[in-house]
Each structure stands twice: as structure tokens, then as C-alpha cells.
Amino acid sequence: PAKVAATRGYGANVILEGINYDESYSKAKEIAKETGATIIQAFDDPQIIAAQGVIGLEILEDLPDVDEIYLPIGGGGLAAGTVIAIKEKNPNIKVIGVQSKSFPSMYESVKQNVRTLTGGDRTIADGISVKMPGEITFEIIKNLIDEIVLVDDEEITKAMFLLMERMKFVVEPAGAVGLAYLISKKPSPGKKVVVVLAGGNVDMYLLGQIVDKGLAAMSRLLKLSVLLPDRPGAFKEIVDIITLANANIVEVVHDRLSSDVNAGSASVTMNLETQGKEQAESLIKSLE
């Protein structure tokens, strides 16, 4: 939604078709054939690849002794251009591409040594949800890139949350895959590492979910369900324990009617803010 709204805001006519890049591109070719419109390639074009290769030159200008570079791969334009620039200047620099586990098209294509149609599952990294890599980009990447690795949505979520909280960067899921890999698979000590953060087009609703999931993963947002006797003061006893632990109640759902709640009892589900895992574990222990 964020990308669509922004594009329409600049005056473009946006036609929504398909659930991933490949399906949308197929429709775009139909429209171009019917109307005579010009197709502008997203990645599989020499000029697009060359333009994105400027990123590689800028990396070398800022950090000429870099050891490893991590960057996202969808169709492969960014990776192909960057790896050409890097390897031309210094073949010893390691370039690692990162894809979503839901759309591992370039990963599988390089592995099979032939362009391979893969993927189709949903991923929050919609910017790299490409089922088939480009012809030009595949040939470049299979010959020059050192490695392609995969990450899942949970790892991407953690990376986005870390970028927002620590760096104050809003990076879209597809752009955060490099950091997502490094968080779970730490680089060798002493290495000079560059991570390319590509793109900031992220929907605000998704961003809210990312924040909640990031807080939950760190036990800073805690969901608890307790079964209480349905009598005056029972809930207050729970609240007193939470207050003593210096946690904050964000939301409460009080349920007497569900079939799994016995007569004379009440189920209470609470969302709590805590300071982290240690405080959360201490609170749970106090409530047991």
C-alpha cells in the first residue's frame, strides 16, 4: 500500500495485478503490447545493472579495505551491478547475496546452474519476491558472486526492529535482509563488513506489527493469560503483583463466557510492557 500510494501521489496510473513481481510483470507486458507503452525493466537490463553498480564504487571509495559485502537479491539487478564493480577493482572482496527463503530463485538457479522457477509463498520482503531471476543478472551473478544465503521473515523482522531502535533507520523488509543474516550468522571477528540497506518503502500498518513483534521477541511486550476465581478483588491481586514488578498493563481482556472457562471462573488475558527478558521471567515466576 505504501508504494502504491506514493506512486499514485506522483501522478502515475497504477494497475494492480498478481501477488508477486512475476505476475505483475506478465500483465505489464500484455498492457505494453496492447497500448504501445514502453516496458522499463526492473533489473534485467544492462543500463539498470550498470547504474546500480555505482553502489559498489561508492563502497570502495568510502571503505577500500572492506572484506565482505552483504546485499539483497530479488531479480538480481543490484547484486549484479555491485559485484561487477567490486570484483573489477578487487577480486578478493567477498560479496554475499541474501534472499528470502520464500523466494530463493537466484539461490536455486546458481545451485542448479540454470535459471530456475521457485518460490510463491508470501513474505514481508515483497521487494525481492521474484520467482525467476533475470537472464542477464543470472549469468553475471553465477560467475562472480561468492555466496548466496537465505533468511526468513522472523529474521527480517528482528533486523528491521534493530535498525529502527538503534540506528533510527526505517528500512523496508527487502532492504534489511543483509542485516537479518548477520544477526543470526555473525561474521568472522575482525572483518570489515558492509551491509547494503536498499529501500525504505514500508507500509505503516506493517511497521506497527514489526515494532510489536520486535518487542515481543525481546520479552519487552508480554502476553499473559491467567484463570481467576470470579470474585471481587481477584484481579486486583494480579494487578498488585504486576505493579510491584514495575510492568505496565497495555491491554486487558476479561472473559467469562468461553466454553473452556468453567462457571465461577474468569479468564484474563493481558498485554504487558516490561523492561526485558529478565524482568518478564521474574514477573511470570511471581504470578505462578
Give a label for each model feature.
Residues 10, 37-43, 119-121:
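Short beta-strands and strand-loop turn motifs
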Residues 16-17, 39-42, 71, 97-98, ...:
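General beta-strand structural signal in soluble alpha/beta enzymes
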Residues 204-288:
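A conserved regulatory-domain signal marking ACT and ACT-like small-molecule sensing domains
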